[in-house]
Curated annotation (Swiss-Prot):
SUPFAM superfamilies documented for this protein: NAD(P)-binding Rossmann-fold domains
Residues reported in the UniProt entry to bind substrate: S140
Protein name (database record): Carbonyl reductase [NADPH] 1
The protein's Enzyme Commission number: 1.1.1.184, 1.1.1.196, 1.1.1.197, 1.1.1.71
Binding of glutathione, residues: F95, K96, T97, Q106, A193, Y194
Protein family membership: Belongs to the short-chain dehydrogenases/reductases (SDR) family.
Annotated localization: Cytoplasm
Taxonomic lineage from the root: Eukaryota, Metazoa, Chordata, Craniata, Vertebrata
Entry-linked Pfam families: adh_short
Active site, renumbered: Y194 (proton acceptor)
Length: 277
């Protein structure tokens, strides 16, 4: 086992917001910080960059689209640390606005990573979260705006306090199927694949927080979704209003909520404040 038994982990962390979250956690979290990336060479280059700044992150490969990759990480964490203290689910993708890929393919590809990949990471790693652990799912304000563009019926489902993970999975699959059949507008969906996937991430966070409260209420684990803002990254583009450092502020705040904090839990957070879902 590692000499430091506390560990924080960030997915999709070789660049952008994820990279800065790792840097901030290296400075402020008392324990090991694991930077993960799909591409090993890029991940190790990011670690070297932080080492040049005098920081000491560790690297582990993780492709959230690959269940075997997730399980290899799970086994590493279990063996080396006996669990996980902080999980930041940051990995995600988006097609550029000008991309000419057919919408139904954009929907399928984006959903596979942003929703189902994140869900698979949660399925494998949430059971490892230690008492007083922190889980942060990086969603987007686009999820709030996209929710408002959904039909009233879909809004009610996504805002439900009793929606199950299985029901949410069914809805995410239905969106992809509806885009393939060319009926997504008729079925009440907005014209944004990215936005719908992030609705999924936000609602999944609410479901998982509810489950944690029911099953591990005494462990004081806090799980939230958050919006980093519009950030100057490869995804956000050069005209975005925030630097990656500013974008990392809310995720890091949630990752480092003090051990005696009662909340927030199961909320959507922007600018360190709870936003009505």
């Amino acid at each position: 086992m590692s000499s430091s038994n506390c560990v924080a982990l960030v997915t999709g962390a070789n660049k952008g917001i994820g990279f800065v979250i790792v840097r901030d956690l290296c400075r402020r979290f008392s324990g090991d910080v694991v930077l993960t990336a799909r591409d090993e060479a890029r991940g190790r280059a990011a670690v070297q960059q932080l080492q040049a700044e005098g920081l000491s992150p560790l690297f582990h490969q993780l492709d959230i689209d690959d269940r075997q990759s997730i399980r290899a990480l799970r086994d590493f964490l279990r063996k080396e640390y006996g669990g996980l203290d902080v999980l930041v689910n940051n990995a995600g993708i988006a097609f550029k606005t000008a991309d000419t890929t057919p919408f139904h393919i954009q929907a399928e590809v984006t959903m596979k990573t942003n929703f189902f990949g994140t869900r698979d990471v949660c399925t494998e790693l949430l059971p490892l979260i230690k008492p007083q652990g922190r889980v942060v799912n990086v969603s987007s304000f686009v999820s709030v705006n996209s929710l408002k563009k959904c039909s009233r019926e879909l809004q009610q489902k996504f805002r439900s306090e009793t929606i199950t993970e299985e029901e949410l999975v069914g809805l995410m699959n239905k969106f992809v199927e509806d885009t393939k059949n060319g009926v997504h507008r008729k079925e009440g969906w907005p014209d944004t694949a990215y936005g719908v996937t992030k609705i999924g991430v936000t609602v999944l966070s609410r479901i998982h927080a509810r489950k944690l409260s029911e099953q591990r209420g005494g462990d004081k684990i806090l799980l939230n979704a958050c919006c980093p803002g519009w950030v100057r990254t490869d995804m956000g583009g050069p005209k975005a209003s925030k630097s990656p450092e500013e974008g990392a502020e809310t995720p890091v705040y949630l990752a480092l909520l003090p051990s005696d904090a009662e909340g927030p839990h199961g909320e959507f957070i922007s600018e360190k404040r709870v936003v009505q879902w």
